[in-house]
């Protein structure tokens, strides 16, 4: 088995385990929580599922980007929130808003089954010949790698609560597999990164990231912690899902574009993350709505 084939199998496995672990920690009440707060749900979906893809499209139209980078940016914009998102929020917000992050992830996963393929279809119409993908395989990927393990995790939490003692181990294994896959993929494609980097590529990725942070921050509401959560939710998409979806498109270099976009985006969000940590440390943050 080649390294590429092994990575192709390991990425979906890491996604499955990560979402399974999250599903074991949440409950259906988490989705009802957002449904009972329509204003918060509307602002969240507007930022993550409407404005983030719009920003991706506009940025791609502004720059002369390699088609693989276009696919990468729009795929990341429509992918569900990353499985480690709620954990990443723990040092940045109050415990109550960390729960909001978990609920936001739950809603993002459920809604992504419909919204991700729909958005891919709309983007395909916008870009015409630059992006080709059948929305049905995209939906199948989201269902099999995200919705299915989430449902299994919820069932385990409901009918086999003793299994919770393995939750941390499952999450750890998932993180290790994802990390190893990312490093292995980076090693494999390092010599080909220059094939997708054109003039303005890094600027485009940074611009998309900063605009996404700004949109999430502004739509987060009056609570500083809510703003932090929604800002990161708008830009923190699951790289594994994005890579799997990108591999369905007719751009063989698209997974390389996803990896490049994730690396540059992580660097671009660092100043905002540092600011929110300092704000949290000074006690000047305000908790979000409950």
Task: Give the location of each predicted region.
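Alpha-helical transmembrane segments of multi-pass small-molecule/ion transporters
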Residues: 1-290
